[in-house]
Amino acid sequence: PEKPNFRPNVNFVPGPAVDYVCDLNEKFPFADGEFEGIFSAYLIEHMRMLRLKGFLSECYRVVQPESYVFFITANLYEQCKKLADKAPGAWDEDDICMIFAGKPDEPGNYHHCGFSPEMAVRYFEEAGFREVKIFEHPNCVTDMIIQARRGLG
């Protein structure tokens, strides 16, 4: 089979690999079912929780029926377990950044929400996705990969 077309690269800030800059809190400037799939890495934890449902509904709208979406995001449950396992007073700057900021490499690069695997499944299912599966990131136990499929409807 052919590789799925995961272009264009859409972001809310310009960059060398960005094809479209748009406000991801608004309706996407794409037709219904325009894309064969979506791949997103470390984006949704930077969105406001109140806008996340609309964002996921837009992702559902722009992918073709039976298509898959893949999201890599922080696993807040595993992050909290990691912090809880540390001795009192042993937290450092990296621990705080893990929960609240990701990598503070630019202004506004903060986490506005977080997900346990169960919460992620619920949000994706509420947006209409089916077959929602959560995988541990192979290189980082405190991150997860969300795979979900759009149904025929």
PLM regions and their residue ranges:
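S-adenosyl-L-methionine-dependent methyltransferase catalytic module, highlighting the catalytic core
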Residues: L50-Q64, Y68-G153
